[in-house]
């Protein structure tokens, strides 16, 4: 118990003690080196680099042992609660190392058989999964959404380990993310599961992510038998029983619960449908008692979320479309990737939004391209994160069509792609 609390204490933000800096160590899949040896070598590396500025990643090493066994060493999440990159003295911090290897297997399907039918009820990943690597960093939000979610889950686990009386202080281990489509709610849930599996790798050997297929669960055929819901959650219970695993249950588009319940009240669905809804809520109530489970849910239609479910959620976080500042960060990350891959060539330095603010948005040879990117970001407001991540590809496909392009040429293409996106939206709206 004390060991578990110690792990969590290391992961939680400190108030009076020295700040904690998290370092993720991606061990190569082919490596069989002991974590203790990797830990020792990485700490030697960090001792040689006492001062860092914000997040930083090493992918090349002087030491042969690290080269053979480690893909990358990353100081991460320093900017979740601090607006600007600031110098960090590692010698004055508590450095928490999180060593992990990625699971390359991909998702498997959880099938439920009933007579002649075979329904895919859920997708199942063993975490940390290669599929989700880098997903956390790709998600950009204006408010401290990511840090709040991390702190929430850490607190739920701490309260469980400390045996806090849940009759006096209640928490349900249920997170609800709601907002318009395309804002990254489902991706954030998957990224959060991955991040927590890595951060708590000293406590749990691996993570399990079960994504329940809401459309199958509440289809007409499926609603005829609540037994299948119980059978599905029994499979989840088997995973939870393994105390070496941290289990995440993801229910996407949870408003399906409401749709089924309201249809029953209106008399348009069989009474079995309401039994299935109640069975799901009952099963959630049962599995949330376990300290190694977190229930993650999303909804595209905020006003249609079932009240019975909303009451169960500890955190109800709205995820809206990105602001111009967030869009700038998204575009900047896309441009950096294209320069790294030499599709945009030659490489040119772009200023961050904070750096533009510091020079008062004055145009000169250094700031000119970044100011153009800022203008494109402003006129992109209203587009979802999903669309924004596609636009660099569309810009190249529609307006570049060459192996390499200068950054000036690409920004011009990106601007045209944004204009085209809004034109297409107007045309679609005219037909509706």
Swiss-Prot record:
UniProt-reported outcome of changing residue 247 to M: In OZEMA9; uncertain significance
Keyword Nucleotide-binding: yes
Outcome when changing residue 198 to V: In OZEMA9; uncertain significance
Domain of life of the organism encoding this protein: Eukaryota
Noted disease: Mosaic variegated aneuploidy syndrome 3: A form of mosaic variegated aneuploidy syndrome, a severe disorder characterized by mosaic aneuploidies, predominantly trisomies and monosomies, involving multiple different chromosomes and tissues. Affected individuals typically present with severe intrauterine growth retardation and microcephaly. Eye anomalies, mild dysmorphism, variable developmental delay, and a broad spectrum of additional congenital abnormalities and medical conditions may also occur. Oocyte/zygote/embryo maturation arrest 9: An autosomal recessive infertility disorder due to oocyte meiotic arrest at metaphase I. Abnormal zygotic cleavage has been observed in some patients.
Subunit structure: Specifically interacts with the ligand binding domain of the thyroid receptor (TR). This interaction does not require the presence of thyroid hormone for its interaction. Interacts with HPV16 E1. Interacts with proteasome subunit PSMA8; to participate in meiosis progression during spermatogenesis.
Protein name from the UniProt record: Pachytene checkpoint protein 2 homolog
Source organism: Homo sapiens
Gene (name only): TRIP13
